[in-house]
């Protein structure tokens, strides 16, 4: 019997266990099976955007950093990009549940 597919936003992170954006970024990359450069890169395919958005969501949930700081750690993205992507992802996750 096949194991249930895990939601791509859930990377198994406890916010209190990760103390830096770089640790969150590395953990998300590991959970998604991609290199960190995929999260910081400019690719727009699903294999790059899903881990990137999961990083945004995990970093926002930790509540330690501003959207600008999160965007910089994600390869120089603007704070509005971080907010828009994370809001969309969290809204989709709520409607699926």
Q: How would you name each of these model-derived features?
A:
Residues 29, 60, 71-72:
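Residue-level preference for well-ordered alpha-helical positions
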Residues 48-65:
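Short, amphipathic alpha-helical "recognition" segments used to contact nucleic acids or chromatin
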Residues 66-68, 72-85:
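Short, basic interhelical loop/turn and adjoining N-cap
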Residues 1-27:
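General nucleic-acid-binding
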Residues 42-47, 72-75:
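Small/polar glycine-rich anion-binding or flexible loop at a beta-alpha turn
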Residues 31-45:
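Short, Lys/Arg-enriched N-terminal segment that forms or immediately precedes the first helix
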Residues 84-97:
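Short, solvent-exposed alpha-helical "recognition" segments
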Residues 13, 34, 67:
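Conserved catalytic core of nucleotide polymerization and phosphodiester-bond processing enzymes
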């Amino acid at each position: 019997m096949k194991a249930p597919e895990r939601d791509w936003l859930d990377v198994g992170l406890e916010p209190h266990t990760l103390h830096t954006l770089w640790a969150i970024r590395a953990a998300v990359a590991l959970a998604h099976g991609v290199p960190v450069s995929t999260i910081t890169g400019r690719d727009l395919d699903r294999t790059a955007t899903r881990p990137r958005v999961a990083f945004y969501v995990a970093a926002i949930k930790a509540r330690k950093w501003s959207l600008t700081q999160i965007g910089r750690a994600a390869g120089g993205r603007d704070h509005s990009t971080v907010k828009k992507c994370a809001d969309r992802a969290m809204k989709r996750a709520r409607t699926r549940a």
